[in-house]
């Protein structure tokens, strides 16, 4: 993986796998809504779950990307897709399931993106911000493109802004030497919270009215 100490690596791996599963759920749900077969569901779940991390590793110069060199992420997305395939009719009554999973995934992947970038390039704030944002919604953009929908990050409520605020929270707390575990909780809580509140209250960024 990355050249990090054991505890940090383990925490990031656990969070990364959790975020991968959460985003894989959103990919599987989108695929089912668009009447994909089981193979299509697995592919879209995998695209959504891992390609944000692949983009992150690419700009950080990590080759091959961790999600390809360690197949555990693909195993997790495949299992997740199959589970959703069989349980979909039991879960579809929960109307907000997609939004909840997407918001949690946004928070977790914002954290893992900035954490890994900071561990490698602690003084390159531009790279840290880009890494956090790409990890957070890179897979989601490709998910929406695959099903021919406008990417949520560009159209739905407050999305990219929530991730960006999470990145800023991370940088502030890390520079204040707040312990990583507390920083992690705050980043996930703030990013996910802003996203869910924006959905609930229908917050949107300004756009041109046609």
Model features per residue range: what roles?
Residues 43-47, 54-60, 130, 134, ...:
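Short, structured motif recognition centered on aromatic/hydrophobic residues
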């Amino acid at each position: 993986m990355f050249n990090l100490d054991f505890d940090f690596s383990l925490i990031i791996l656990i969070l990364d796998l959790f975020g991968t599963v959460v985003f894989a759920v959103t990919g599987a749900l989108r695929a089912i809504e668009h009447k994909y077969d089981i193979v299509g569901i697995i592919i879209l779940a995998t695209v959504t779950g891992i390609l944000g991390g692949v983009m992150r590793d690419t700009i950080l110069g990590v080759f091959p990307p961790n999600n390809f060199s360690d197949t555990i992420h693909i195993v997790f997305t495949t299992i997740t897709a199959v589970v959703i395939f069989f349980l979909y009719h039991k879960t579809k009554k929960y109307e907000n399931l997609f939004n909840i999973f997407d918001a949690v995934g946004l928070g977790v992947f914002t954290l893992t993106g900035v954490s890994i970038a900071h561990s490698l390039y602690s003084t390159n704030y531009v790279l840290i911000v880009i890494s956090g944002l790409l990890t957070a919604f890179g897979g989601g953009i490709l998910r929406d493109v695959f099903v021919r929908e406008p990417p949520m990050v560009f159209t739905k409520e407050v999305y990219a802004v929530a991730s960006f605020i999470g990145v800023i929270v991370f940088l502030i707390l890390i520079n204040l030497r707040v312990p990583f575990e507390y920083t992690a909780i705050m980043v996930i809580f703030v990013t996910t919270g802003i996203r869910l509140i924006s959905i609930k209250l229908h917050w949107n960024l300004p756009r041109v009215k046609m």
